[in-house]
């Protein structure tokens, strides 16, 4: 159903007129099994479904004066044909042959293939009804079988197909295509002036231009369209680029179909909440496991608890603050969110929080504000935790319950630049090792400060402009869908190159971002109004922080001492 929102000229039926906003209805009886779309199979067999000046011209037949004898013979034949009643068996066979031949014609028809690239729910339901009716007819022919087992099987199958047909009939009443002839009268000079229209799914795309601000047009136009359609509809305003010309379009779709799409992908279910709780417990376990990697070799269980509790507290503070900020911002914009799913990792303990949008976004500002609320609050909380820990310890040496960061942890990973900037190198230019560095163990860092440092790195990973990560959502709001798709592909490619170069984190995060958070968000109802200069500036600032935090700096922040491997007191220089 994702294709329901993307307006591509190649996947929809283009309906144009040279003189006015004109629609042609295709509702001949022989094509009723295939929904709205049909093809005129007269002398213009399977012609392009396009309203144009050529279609509007009337092709008059050649008038020839028939002879009286020929006219009398034709009248006699017509009279005989009308008086001869067709047999029921022959009519059923002819209808079945006609239906099969018609389906074969549709399979070979190029215009039908284009239409099925953007099928409507109504057309799909009618196609299923046709197949169900055909199966019922086949079962009725086999109902006289003498085998009792086959008879029972046919009876059960017939009951099942009958229920299926009733269900499809009810669904057909719900999902009917909108009558674009009625809808076109709702557009005008005071809302959105439509100059062209084409069918898209069970709704349509009206091409034209806005005459007033979108905030004024949207409620007024939705009310008029819903009244004309006899049911609720949803309206989007977008920009469509064709032949290097940008046009404003208004897309109209039945609200029932949009609700069905969100219902099919909804995660606010019992299983969704169970999965969220399971991932939360798993993430707490990976945080506890990761904490043990940085203890002293002779650490006791009390030392472990003393180190793990601050790290847990730091992570929970970052996650809690960012989650509250995200929920409050989403509620302010009227957007429903799914349960939040933690991403466990045995490298950083947690790789962030994921959730989906379960309702339509009102505009690009909402698409921008919600991910920015999460990432900005996580950055600020992480920075405050690190600063508070360093201030309380009075130094950068970790205090009494320090975690010891091993040298291998600094090699070729995203923590390198920022952690080195905060705690300093293992040795300065003169070879003097930090006073509290432990030979063979690492540099001591306060657990609460380390939670803040990890929080900044994890937030930066989620700010990468890829798919439906927070950074991908921000890029889509700032630059549009096409540019965001290019950035997403480039980011996935760079992560793949990093993974092939030996970085397990790049490989794992690249696979996760591409396959689990790939794609793009549902378009906002207002895709025309930009986010504004202030939001654009904030997006650039967040992008710079992400870049500076994750930039692969193999030489370290202190270039002269970190070109060589880390070393400790007692090593030969």
Curated annotation (Swiss-Prot):
Top-rank lineage group of the source organism: Eukaryota
Residue numbers spanned by region Disordered: 38-105
GO biological process, one term: proteolysis
Role according to the record: Probable membrane-associated metalloprotease that may be involved in chloroplast development.
Regions of compositional bias (Basic and acidic residues) in chain numbering: 52-62, 96-105
E.C. no: 3.4.24.-
Mode of membrane association: Multi-pass membrane protein
Subcellular locations according to the entry: Plastid, Chloroplast membrane
Transit peptide segment: 1-50
GO cellular component, as recorded: chloroplast membrane
Name of the coding gene: EGY3
Molecular-function GO terms, alphabetical: metallopeptidase activity
Transmembrane segments: 274-294, 305-325, 376-396, 414-434, 441-461, 493-513, 536-556
Coiled coil: 122-185
Family per similarity comment: Belongs to the peptidase M50B family.
Top-level EC class as recorded in UniProt: hydrolase
Keywords on record: Chloroplast, Coiled coil, Hydrolase, Membrane, Metalloprotease, Plastid, Protease, Transit peptide, Transmembrane, Transmembrane helix
Official protein name in the record: Probable zinc metallopeptidase EGY3, chloroplastic
Cited PANTHER family: ZINC METALLOPEPTIDASE EGY3, CHLOROPLASTIC-RELATED, ZINC METALLOPROTEASE EGY1
Species per Swiss-Prot/TrEMBL record: Arabidopsis thaliana (Mouse-ear cress)
């Amino acid at each position: 159903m994702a294709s329901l929102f993307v307006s591509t000229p190649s996947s929809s039926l283009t309906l144009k007129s040279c003189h006015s906003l004109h629609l042609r209805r295709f509702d001949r009886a022989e094509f009723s099994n295939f929904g709205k779309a049909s093809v005129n199979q007269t002398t213009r067999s399977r012609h392009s479904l396009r309203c144009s000046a050529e279609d509007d011209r009337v092709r008059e037949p050649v008038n020839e004066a028939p002879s009286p004898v020929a006219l009398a013979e034709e009248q006699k034949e017509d009279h005989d044909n009308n008086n001869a009643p067709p047999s029921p068996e022959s009519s059923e066979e002819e209808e079945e042959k006609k239906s099969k031949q018609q389906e074969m014609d549709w399979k070979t028809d190029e215009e039908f293939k284009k239409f099925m690239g953007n099928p409507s729910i109504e057309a799909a339901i009618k196609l299923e009804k046709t197949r169900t009716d055909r199966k019922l007819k086949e079962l009725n022919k086999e109902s006289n079988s003498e085998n009792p087992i086959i008879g029972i099987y046919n009876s059960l199958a017939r009951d099942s197909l009958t229920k299926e047909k009733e269900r499809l009939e009810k669904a057909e009443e719900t999902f009917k295509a909108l009558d674009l002839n009625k809808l076109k009268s709702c557009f005008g000079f005071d809302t959105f002036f439509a100059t062209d229209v084409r069918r898209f799914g069970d709704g349509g795309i009206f091409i034209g231009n806005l005459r007033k601000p979108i905030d004024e047009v949207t409620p007024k136009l939705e009310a008029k369209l819903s009244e004309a359609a006899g049911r609720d509809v949803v309206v989007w305003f977008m920009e469509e680029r064709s032949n290097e010309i940008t046009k404003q379009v208004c897309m109209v779709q039945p609200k029932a179909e949009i609700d069905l799409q969100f219902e099919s992908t909804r995660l606010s279910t019992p299983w969704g909440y169970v999965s969220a709780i399971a991932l939360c417990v798993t993430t707490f376990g990976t945080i506890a496991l990761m904490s043990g990697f940085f203890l002293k070799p002779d650490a006791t269980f009390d030392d472990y608890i003393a180190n793990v509790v601050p790290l847990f507290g730091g992570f929970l503070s970052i996650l809690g603050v960012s989650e509250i900020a995200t929920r409050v911002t989403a509620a302010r914009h009227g957007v429903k969110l799914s349960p939040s799913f933690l991403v466990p990792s045995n490298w950083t303990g947690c790789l962030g929080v994921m959730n989906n949008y379960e309702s339509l976004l009102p505009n690009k500002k909402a698409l921008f504000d919600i991910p920015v609320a999460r990432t900005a609050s996580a950055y600020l909380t992480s920075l405050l935790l690190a600063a508070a820990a360093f201030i309380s310890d009075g130094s950068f040496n970790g205090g009494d319950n320090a975690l010891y960061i091993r040298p291998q942890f600094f090699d070729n990973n995203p923590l390198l630049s920022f952690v080195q900037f905060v705690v300093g190198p293992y040795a300065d230019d003169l070879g003097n090792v930090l006073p509290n560095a432990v030979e063979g163990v690492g540099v001591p860092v306060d657990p609460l400060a380390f939670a803040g440092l990890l929080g900044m790195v994890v937030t930066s990973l989620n700010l990468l402009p890829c798919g439906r990560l927070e950074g991908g959502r921000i890029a889509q709001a700032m630059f549009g869908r096409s540019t965001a798709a290019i950035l997403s592909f480039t980011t996935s490619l760079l992560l793949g190159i990093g993974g092939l170069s030996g970085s397990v984190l790049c490989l794992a995060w690249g696979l996760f971002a591409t396959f689990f958070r790939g794609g793009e968000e549902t378009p906002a109802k207002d895709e025309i109004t930009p986010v504004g200069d202030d939001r654009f500036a904030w997006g650039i600032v967040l992008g710079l922080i992400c870049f500076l935090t994750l930039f692969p700096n193999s030489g370290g922040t202190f270039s002269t001492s970190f070109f060589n491997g880390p070393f400790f007191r007692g090593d030969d220089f």
